[in-house]
Amino acid sequence: MDTLEKINPQDMKNMVTFFPELLNVIEISPQIKSVLKEFRAEDIKGICYVGMGGSSIAGSYTQYYLSDKLKIPLHVVRNYSLPKYVDNKWIVILTSYSGNTEETISSLRNAMDRNLRTICISSNGKITEIGKNVVAIPGKIQPRAAFPLLFSTVLTITELALSEKNTDFSRVADFLKEQAKLWGKVFPEPIEVASLFHHKIPLYIASGYLVPVAYRAKCQINENSKHPAFYSEIPEANHNEIEGFADSIAKELVPIFLRGNNEKQEILKRIDITYDLYKDMGLNPLVLKVDDAEPLEEMLALTHYLDMVSVELAFLDKANPVSVDRISELKRRMAQS
């Protein structure tokens, strides 16, 4: 039985459990590899990642992970059209899990009108009908639970396009499985962290390549737990956010610092001081860090863990982590207007 056959699409905890295995499901076809080889034959000025919600976050992870390795810009678009500076020397990677995301379809039409080089990642829908160079992915699971599928695909396509060494996702998956065995030992059990958020508001704080992890964690609390959450980036948050919490509001916050193994000295100092300032306010900040790991391992191990935290919080809040009723209603009304 393969990984996808083991997954229950109506059980979010089950889907999160299979996070590591989902990193290894997709193989890039010879046809797409050939297209990427053609793209490489000409100058590549930049890569633009297009998507919304769970389909966009794979681009953000790729952008932050590769930002210190590449000499070209990586840009994420969450909108109906592409910036004017994205021309035919860029590669546009459009991701829509359902294939029917209206903003992404609009951006694809915009790219086609401008004769841009595109790669589409989707399971079905309009994107697969009108797009060129489509990478087909399985459509069985919830879009936000499909993040490992989407990210491994987006990163691999980027590496192939730029002749970068391909990431060994089998090794990364094995690392994540070993990390999950440490939940309740090195890391608190996810239910323990979720209980800290019950009737409180999580504030995820990160810097550098862990910023998209904080953003993803915030979104997972919103969608899975039906619960408010926020995220912020150091150093920017030191110039505004730390003044934003009056005592009556601050007591409702639970700051969670996502720490990395490669923090620059000035960032390390800022995070330490920010932690102390929150302690001075009477808060109880939490620190999460994956020791002895490479950046990508840190990013994905924290993501896997925090995904499970969001599911446990949903259970505590008596929320259905699978349903997204308001998002569905908004889409229904948009389709009518």
PLM region spans:
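A generic structural motif
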Residues: 76-79, 227-238, 284-293
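Glycine-rich phosphate-binding loops that contact phosphosugars or nucleotide phosphates
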Residues: 38-181, 195, 260-286
